[in-house]
Amino acid sequence: WQGRQNLLGSFSYGGDCSLILSGQTLNIMKLTANITLDELTKSQTAERKGINNNPSPEQIENLKALAINVLQPIRSHYDKPLIISSGFRCAQLCIEIGSSVNSQHVADNEAAAADFEIPGVDNRELARWIRDNLEVDQGILEFYKDGEPSSGWIHCSYSRNSNRGQWLRAQRIDGKVNYQPWLE
């Protein structure tokens, strides 16, 4: 055991399903069969800046609803892992990256959001499948370029209260982000 402890560094159990390893918390809680809390909370910026990006129990419930109702059905349909580039962001992390503290990524007010893609799946086709098959509060096809299937990513939010079913497309026009209704 001594050799393993030296190899791993110091660690302790942090309660629920968190493991604290050398000062970093690993959220190994499974929210669904294929989606973990760690996937939705990891942030290189938070790690670099020493920001505690661990959600509260209420925020975890919102993330779990997103995972159950949006992320897992996508994972099951495509039978491929999702690459989640941004999930939960604590308010301090939002400020650090220049995002709104009212973003659904904060997972407050019974809603949560994630940005993701699936390698090898056209992001526009993925957005269409989600739009046609799942209930979401807001979906955004972000920075997709026609003719470049792996460009951009998908943003989806889910509310445990009520979902608007709003779909937008985000594009950069003259250096500014422009959001338009996405109807195609």
What would you call each of these model-derived segments?
Residues 17, 27, 104, 108-112, ...:
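Catalytic cores and adjacent binding grooves of peptidoglycan-active enzymes
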Residues 69-99:
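Extended, low-complexity, intrinsically disordered C-terminal regulatory tails
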Residues 59, 66-70, 93, 112, ...:
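Amphipathic alpha-helical interface surfaces
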Residues 11-13:
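Aromatic (phenylalanine/tyrosine) cluster motif
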Residues 19, 24-77, 160, 172-184:
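Extracytoplasmic cell-surface/polysaccharide-interacting catalytic and binding patches
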